Amino acid sequence: MASSLTCAGVIWALLSFLCAATSCVGFFMPYWLLGSQMGKPVSFGTFRRCSYPIRDEARGGTVMLEQCGRYASFQGIPSLEWRICTVVTGIGCGLLLLVALTAIMGCCVTDLISRTIGRVAGGIQFVGGLLIGSGCALYPLGWDSEEVRQTCSNSSDQFDLGSCEIGWAYYCTGAGAAAAMVLCTWMACFAGKKQKHYPY
């Protein structure tokens, strides 16, 4: 099977896919922020949450429902910063996935990725990683929302976790973005083969 990638390009394609998958899994999982409420573990993502209080009509009180789910609407996300983070990080993940899938196709299709296309793809990966990094930087601005404060012993504030801690999904998302910005962007410069010039 013919390829439009150099040996470095094949490594770039695999690394691009790994970085995109890492960032996307981290973005989708609701384990960015970990805490507890009413003795139950609670976790937050940018647009998802695990364990939340509901009104128990039978007992006439509030109980914790231990399951994960999305917020009912975009406006239901606890803070404006988390809404912006969701959009920015989602776009960044989409860009990384687009380049990764194109790079994987370049392993199987001739003349798909030239040196110029490889460099453009690297630039897109840099922008995608930058967007995800911006989303990760915005996330702590939402720690002062009421939902987070209830989970973090009413002691959290912007850039202050209180009794909560950062979860693995936050690190996963950031690490995928950082690797895409540094490694993938650099390797993309050497990914495509030199185009043949055909005489007409």
From Swiss-Prot:
It is found in: Membrane. GO terms for cellular component: membrane. It is a multi-pass membrane protein. Glycans are attached at N154. Keywords: Glycoprotein, Membrane, Signal, Transmembrane, Transmembrane helix. The chain crosses the membrane at residues 84-104, 123-143, 172-192. PANTHER family: LHFPL TETRASPAN SUBFAMILY MEMBER 6 PROTEIN-RELATED, LIPOMA HMGIC FUSION PARTNER-LIKE PROTEIN. Belongs to the LHFP family. This is LHFPL tetraspan subfamily member 6 protein.
